[in-house]
Amino acid sequence: DLGAEKFYDIKCRMNNLQPAATILVTSLRALKWHGGVPLPEIGKENMDALINGLPNLKAHIISLKRFGQQVVVSLNHFANDNEEEIDVVRKECLAAGVRFAISDGFAKGGEGALDVAREVMAAVKEGSKPLNYAYSLDESIEEKIQDVNTKVYGGQDVSYSSAALKDLAKIKALNMGFEKLPICIAKTPFSMSHDPDLKGAPHGFTLPVQRVILNAGAGFLVVTTGAIMRMPGLPKKPA
């Protein structure tokens, strides 16, 4: 919901790239966290929490397939992972029509990543469809934000702060075509939504837009949502 959407809608669009496949990385621990387990306990066996967290994985799979991608789910393996829990995730992926492989590269090096490599090669051979972007550049800024919110995040509506409304008015008043730029939405990485406390696959929420910032040189509009701190662009040798 963050890296993939921006990669497709900004980088691939601007550089005419067509990915042959996309790897979706997950782990039993991450799924249990989305299933409501506190961080200190995510390494323990907990089938109920795993099942409760699966909607998050399914939401990402649906999103990637909507973009037209061949998807390979790569499960990062930990030494104490339970085989029955792994099998549940495997079956979920196969039922969703995507490939599945276990990645054990941390413990076994390259040999531990061979299964993932094989599945990726098979996916690449089959090939993805031409990218189906989340929005058209001809849409208004508000329409683009709403498209990403509904198609990728699972939200329903968008609200705008007074500062964001002023930002939009200023950008449009420039009358230089900046409304046609792609959007780069800044939000929490801990949820499909803007709220880090909303785990799993929340839906029907209202996305609160705080600011809309023109980055003319970079060629996109930054849309900040919720309480988010943007990543600083630092030089190779920060002061």
For each of these PLM feature ranges, what is it?
Residues 1-85, 89-239:
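P-loop NTP-binding site
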